Amino acid sequence: MFYKLAQKVMFQMDPELAHNIAIGSLKMTGNNLLNCFYRQQVKSSPVTCMGLTFPNPVGLAAGLDKDGESIDAFHAMGFGHVEVGTVTPRPQAGNDQPRLFRLKPAKGIINRMGFNNKGVDNLVRNLMAKKSDIMVGVNIGKNKDTPVEQGKDDYLICMEKVYQYASYIAVNISSPNTPGLRSMQYGELLDDLLSSIKAKQTELAAKHGKYVPVALKIAPDLTSEEISAIADSLMSNQFDGVIATNTTLSRDTVTDLKHAEEMGGLSGKPLADLSTQVIKQLAICLQGKIPIIGVGGINSAADALAKFDAGSTMVQIYSGFIYQGPKLVDQIARAYCAK
């Protein structure tokens, strides 16, 4: 009830303003009695993924809490894990506003944020300050002004700084809002990046006495051949996981809606089938050797079950959380237990 009232107010605002107010409010209330407005007990449904045990298979996708300011609040909502970021080595403002648009009839969102964040050092401070023991994945990216050919260095800088504070690290090369970024999903650029990440992981595991899994986040706008090539590279470089998928550039499912023509990545319900198809193809290619975290268009427990049936070990929500609220976490956890 509280969420529906809050949503009604927020949906009258500019989407980015509403987002900033929400994150600020959650930051202030995450560790005090005011979290009673959203705190909930979620059905226990432990799952093992990437060698880690999560209390339930429902995570918060990257992009909502970019700077890790409200981790404890999302823990109170019962998420099995939170993925913060995308974070870059240096702070950056992102793309010009407006850059966030609701497609309410389709339960979709278009964004062209452009990795706006306060930088990796700020994120590390927030990770150190969190009170809860929730699993936290850190999604890392490159700065916009770093040439793609040198992008690998940005990932390694972020990885070194967040390693000891992260439950796992997600390597984001699939945002459509950073020029040239998606080119890192192919060929020599991909293999060079993954092998460098893996070597850095080995180095940092020895340094900190802690093995932190690494996962690759991929786009939905890939051919079968490209998915197969990515799967081969993941296996040959012994990556621990893959997150499928990021937002899509396709507008096939929202052609006549207001804001559909806006540039950026489309998420939410219109992405559901496309991301599920990618997961199915990945699962065939990976043959159970690398776990898949399914994300994209999960707006109900049934949507989540489709991701599990396609081959996902865990799922993440973002747009569905915006439209449905915290109750979606428990609904998915219960459906997972009952399946």
Swiss-Prot record:
One of its GO terms (molecular function) is dihydroorotate dehydrogenase (quinone) activity. Pathway: Pyrimidine metabolism; UMP biosynthesis via de novo pathway; orotate from (S)-dihydroorotate (quinone route): step 1/1. It is a peripheral membrane protein. GO terms for biological process: 'de novo' pyrimidine nucleobase biosynthetic process; 'de novo' UMP biosynthetic process. Disulfide bonds: none annotated. Keywords: Cell membrane, Flavoprotein, FMN, Membrane, Oxidoreductase, Pyrimidine biosynthesis. It is found in: Cell membrane. The active site is at residue 175. The keyword Cell cycle does not apply. InterPro entries: Aldolase_TIM, DHO_dehydrogenase, Dihydroorotate_DH_1_2, Dihydroorotate_DH_2, Dihydroorotate_DH_cat, Dihydroorotate_DH_CS. HAMAP family: DHO_dh_type2. Belongs to the dihydroorotate dehydrogenase family. Type 2 subfamily. This is Dihydroorotate dehydrogenase (quinone).
